[in-house]
Swiss-Prot record:
It comes from Aliivibrio salmonicida (strain LFI1238) (Vibrio salmonicida (strain LFI1238)). This is Probable phosphatase VSAL_II0887. Zn(2+) 2 binds at E72, H100, H130. Keywords: Hydrolase, Metal-binding, Zinc. The keyword Lipid metabolism does not apply.
Length: 247
C-alpha cells in the first residue's frame, strides 16, 4: 500500500502526534501521500468544526509528502447524519464515516444497516470506516451493494485486524472484504494511526489482501494515481498541486 488515508493528530483528543510528525514518518517510509483525518466534534475530546474548515491553510506537501485534507466523521443517528456542517465539505478532500460507541450507542443489526445505507446515499462520505466492529453488526451484503452503487469505499483497517482494538473484528473484516470482492466494491486501507510511528503499518491488511487475492484495481490506496482517480469518480475537483501524481 502506498497511501495512508486514516491518520490522527493530538487534535483528536486521544492521539499523540502532530501532522508534521505524521508527515515526517510517512516520508521516512517513502510513502508519497497521506491524509489527515482527525475525529469530528461529537467524539469526546475532538475539535470544533472550524478545525476542519481551516485545513485549507495546510500546505499540499510536508516533508515531501502529499497531504490530503480529511475528517473521520461520526455517524450520529438512524438518518445517517454526520457531525460536520455541509459548508465544511468543500474544504475537505476525503471524508470517512464511522460508528463510535460514545456518539452512537450500539443498537441492532437493522438500525445499523439503515444508518449506513442512509449515509451512503447522502453522497457526503467517501468511505465507511472500521466496519468490522462487532458492536455494530449490519447486513454486509446490503450495505456493500449500496456502497458499490454510490462508489463509496469500504475501509479495511489494520488496527481492527490486530485483534486488540474493536475486539472481535478480525473474522468480520475478512468476511466484509470477501463480499466486497464478490460485489466489485472499492476498498481503502489504513493503519488508523494515532501515533506517528504507526504510519504505514499495513502488515495485517496486506495479509488479508494476499489471502483473498483482492484485485489491486479495486484497492484505491494502492497508488496516488488510483486514489486521485477515485476522488475524481466521487466528484471531487482535481487538486492542481497533485497533477504529477495523477499520471
Amino acid at each position: 500500500m502506498r497511501i495512508q488515508v486514516d491518520t490522527h493528530t493530538y487534535a483528536s483528543g486521544h492521539a499523540y502526534s502532530t501532522i508534521s510528525e505524521n508527515a515526517f514518518s510517512a516520508s521516512t517510509l517513502g510513502l508519497p501521500m497521506f491524509c489527515t483525518t482527525d475525529h469530528a466534534s461529537s467524539m469526546p475530546g475532538a475539535p470544533h468544526y472550524w478545525f476542519f474548515s481551516n485545513q485549507r491553510v495546510l500546505p499540499r506537501f510536508l516533508h515531501g509528502v502529499a497531504i490530503l485534507r480529511g475528517c473521520e466523521v461520526n455517524i450520529c443517528n438512524l438518518e445517517g447524519d454526520i457531525d460536520i456542517p455541509l459548508s465544511v465539505d468543500q474544504n475537505l478532500d476525503w471524508i470517512i464515516a464511522s460508528f463510535h460507541e460514545p456518539v452512537f450507542p450500539p443498537k441492532n443489526k437493522l438500525v445499523h444497516t439503515q444508518a449506513l445505507i442512509k449515509i451512503i446515499s447522502s453522497g457526503r462520505v467517501d468511505a465507511l470506516g472500521h466496519l468490522g466492529n462487532p458492536n455494530f453488526d449490519f447486513d454486509f451484503k446490503e450495505v456493500i451493494q449500496e456502497a458499490v452503487k454510490h462508489n463509496v469505499a469500504i475501509e479495511i483497517n489494520n488496527t481492527s485486524l490486530k485483534g486488540t482494538s474493536r475486539v472481535g473484528s478480525v473474522d468480520r473484516c475478512y468476511e466484509i472484504a470477501k463480499i466486497a470482492k464478490e460485489l466489485g466494491a472499492y476498498i481503502t486501507t489504513g493503519s488508523d494511526a494515532h501515533f506517528c510511528q504507526d504510519i504505514g503499518k499495513f502488515e495485517k491488511v496486506e495479509q488479508l489482501i494476499d489471502a483473498l487475492d483482492f484485485p489491486f484495481d479495486k484497492i484505491i490506496t494502492h497508488s496516488p494515481k488510483q486514489f486521485l482517480a477515485f476522488l475524481a469518480l466521487r466528484g471531487h475537483a482535481p487538486i492542481a498541486e497533485f497533477e504529477a501524481l495523477s499520471k
